[in-house]
């Protein structure tokens, strides 16, 4: 894990670190994680009905079976001087039809100083960032995205500072089953300082009528 980490400043207080090929033997780790994780299909309340989340997820003890990821967590904690007490979560995008819409990780509640680390395994996919000011600009290219980091196997991305306050990120759906599988490994930390988020998170039900 000696890849150089380059910092991209999004504005005065929000940044993203990127290290290409940060995780060694990423293809082997992908196959191991894919085979050994207990994948679950989530559901979201959208458009007045429950819909299946367009990706699979894994969390908890089953995720801790992967020694390469445990070692990666130690490296990240040492470098960023934070602790990830909840371990890591896994998101599996089975093909190009899976994805995740633009969102902020508001469920962390305190978003003014966070560290969210992502390691990508498997196929290279678009990964968009846009300022919140563009969140209604759907007529713009890529729905207002200003950056596409296109992470590939073993790449590390770390969102920090006020990134969860003023920026949104997305793994867009490509509508193409020929795109290979992609796994995102996620670690999250918040300083628990500043103003708490009170708005609903990404997974909260979206209702357009009375419940």
Predicted regions and their residues:
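Non-heme Fe(II) oxygenase metal-center motifs and adjacent flexible, charged/small-residue loops
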Residues: 1-211
């Amino acid at each position: 894990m000696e890849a150089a980490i380059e910092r991209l400043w999004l504005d005065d207080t929000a940044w993203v670190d990127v290290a290409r090929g940060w995780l060694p033997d990423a293809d082997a780790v992908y196959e191991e994680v894919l085979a050994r994780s207990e994948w679950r299909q989530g559901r979201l309340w959208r458009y007045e009905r429950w819909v299946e989340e367009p990706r699979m997820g894994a969390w908890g003890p089953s995720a801790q079976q992967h020694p390469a990821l445990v070692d990666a967590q130690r490296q990240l904690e040492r470098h960023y001087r934070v602790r990830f007490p909840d371990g890591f979560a896994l998101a599996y995008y089975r093909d190009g039809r899976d994805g995740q819409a633009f969102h902020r990780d508001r469920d962390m509640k305190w978003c003014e100083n966070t560290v969210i680390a992502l390691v990508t395994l498997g196929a290279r996919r678009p990964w968009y960032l846009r300022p919140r000011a563009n969140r209604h600009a759907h007529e713009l290219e890529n729905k207002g995205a200003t950056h596409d980091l296109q992470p590939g196997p073993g790449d590390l991305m770390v969102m920090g500072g006020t990134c969860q306050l003023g920026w949104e990120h997305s793994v867009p759906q490509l509508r193409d089953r020929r795109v290979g599988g992609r796994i995102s490994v996620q670690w999250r930390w918040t300083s628990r300082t500043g103003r708490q988020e009170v708005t609903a998170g990404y997974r909260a039900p979206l209702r357009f009528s009375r419940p």
